[in-house]
């Protein structure tokens, strides 16, 4: 790992006179174009060549900024992270690395970043950016590069199940690059202290429905300087069955036998492959649960607060493995005491009630509700359009300095629109409370484990999950909302306003 310190960012910005365009209202593409045409200091070239020789692998170019890692209010996933393949032509690799660094610098000034600054009362020209160059963990499969396993580990579990304790933490595991996890993809959620209790694989039907079907890999053939605002421009989105030919599933997959309707641990020729990590979690091929327990213990101990850790792991055919800690950041767990007995408030007095909620404090100044139109026949096909409507409405709230309650089915902030509405944090940054609703035909795990979720908790935004499928999952009194006149209404979204402020506890 190599760090380019903030003084290089300062020199780059000043010597190329980039602040006028960076702080303007120019589009993200226009800002990136100016940054890519600018020059990095020549003094870095020799160091970069030395780094190439030392790593001889693909490189991740990550942001590490002053505000991003603040203990009191950390950002997560707002700035760009690029990856470049390893090339034998060192000068071509140097060009790609330079473009990636400039792309990370440019992302500080994109529209989403500026909206984020506004929402968090930070001043963008006070931001300082360091860049981390890190060897990408993984194996080379010819045209693609990815690790056996990536994960996000949180030492605080806001949704413990059964005999799990909140302080025992939760890990989200996936095949392939970790970008899939932080983008909100379908992962396997497991508590390191209870590796045998995985809800998603507890029943055959759940395992078939709720396990990973896609994964991300670095495209080793994508060579050139055509960098885009989307930092995933050279990331391949593959199906799990594509990994079968790479023979990378040996210790992390199970096979569904359609004739006997059972799931067998291991990879067999016939039947759908399911990413269950059973050989790792239940059969001890590698001591992953123990490693995760140790990582949480020392990570939280060093930061003196709960932490979120990104990690990756390669598992070899001889059952050896290499485990890498990639990033660690604090989880803001602000708490405020509530004296009122919420259970004593009758349901008839409530617009919505959740038995799984996160947040703190009492809010008594919100009068607006923005909600996705849904019923028991809801289809996720239109979630892209929903995201556009909500981003536009959110901009109006930001301009007016007001907040709202946001309600919708599925997982907010997922990059997979089948799992929920694919908004980014700045697109809903004026929301005071965010509600995820599980429906009969659309029952998705909550957002915990994504950068999006981390930002909700950091900024004290109320986060409620409501499961309409169980009598104990809470409720949304949607009939009240549907009967109200709309302040604004689109094909997919309604905005209504109450005469008096709601009381949010």
Q: Which role does the model predict for each range below?
A:
Residues 1-24, 28-42:
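A conserved helix-loop-beta module that forms one wall/lid of the active-site cleft
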Residues 39-438, 455-459, 483, 490-503:
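Conserved mixed alpha/beta core segments that line enzyme active sites in large multi-domain catalysts
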Residues 19-26, 310, 452-459:
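A polyampholytic, Gly/Pro-enriched intrinsically disordered region
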Residues 439-485:
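Polybasic, proline/glycine-rich intrinsically disordered low-complexity segments
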């Amino acid at each position: 790992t190599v760090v380019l310190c903030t003084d290089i960012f300062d020199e780059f910005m000043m010597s190329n006179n980039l602040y006028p365009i960076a702080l303007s209202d120019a589009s993200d593409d226009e800002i990136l174009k100016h940054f890519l045409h600018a020059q990095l200091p020549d003094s870095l070239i020799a160091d970069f060549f030395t780094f190439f020789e030392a790593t001889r692998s693909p490189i991740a170019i990550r942001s590490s900024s002053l505000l991003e890692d603040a203990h009191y209010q950390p950002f997560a996933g707002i700035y760009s992270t690029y990856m470049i393949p390893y090339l034998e032509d060192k000068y071509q690799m140097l060009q790609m690395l330079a473009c990636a660094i400039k792309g990370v610098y440019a992302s500080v000034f994109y529209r989403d970043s500026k909206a984020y600054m506004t929402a968090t009362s930070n001043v963008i020209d006070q931001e300082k950016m360091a860049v981390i160059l890190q060897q990408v963990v993984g194996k080379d499969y010819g045209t693609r590069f990815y690790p056996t396993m990536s994960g996000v580990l949180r030492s605080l579990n806001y949704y413990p199940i059964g005999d799990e304790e909140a302080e025992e933490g939760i890990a989200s595991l996936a095949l392939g690059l970790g970008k899939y996890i932080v983008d909100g993809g379908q992962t396997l959620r497991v508590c390191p202290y209870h590796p045998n209790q995985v809800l998603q694989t507890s029943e055959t039907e759940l395992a078939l429905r709720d396990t990973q079907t896609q994964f991300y890999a670095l495209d080793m053939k994508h060579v050139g300087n055509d960098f885009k605002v989307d930092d995933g421009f050279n990331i391949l989105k593959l199906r799990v069955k594509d990994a079968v030919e790479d023979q990378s599933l040996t210790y992390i997959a199970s096979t569904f036998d359609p004739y006997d309707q059972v799931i067998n641990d291991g990879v067999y020729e016939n039947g759908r492959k399911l990413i269950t990590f059973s050989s790792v979690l239940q059969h001890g091929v590698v001591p992953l649960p123990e490693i995760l327990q140790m990582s949480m213990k020392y990570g939280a101990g060093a930061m003196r607060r709960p932490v979120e850790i990104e990690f990756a792991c390669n598992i070899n055919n001889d059952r050896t493995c290499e485990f890498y800690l990639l990033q660690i950041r604090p989880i803001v767990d602000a708490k405020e005491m509530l004296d009122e007995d919420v259970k004593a408030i009758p349901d008839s007095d409530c617009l919505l009630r959740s038995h799984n909620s996160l947040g703190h404090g009492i809010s008594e100044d919100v009068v607006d509700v923005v909600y996705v139109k849904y019923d028991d026949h809801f289809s996720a096909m239109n979630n892209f359009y929903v995201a556009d409507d909500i981003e536009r409405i959110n901009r109006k709230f930001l301009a007016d300095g007001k907040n709202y309650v946001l309600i919708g089915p599925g997982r907010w902030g997922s990059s997979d629109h089948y799992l929920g509405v694919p908004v980014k944090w700045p697109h809903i940054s004026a929301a005071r409370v965010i509600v995820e609703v599980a429906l009969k035909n659309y029952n998705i795990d909550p957002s915990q484990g994504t950068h999006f979720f981390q930002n909700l908790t950091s900024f004290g935004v109320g986060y409620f999950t409501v499961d309409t499928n169980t009598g104990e999952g809470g409720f949304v009194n949607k009939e009240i909302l549907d009967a109200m006149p709309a302040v604004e209404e689109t094909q997919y979204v309604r905005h209504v306003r109450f005469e008096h402020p709601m009381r949010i506890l």
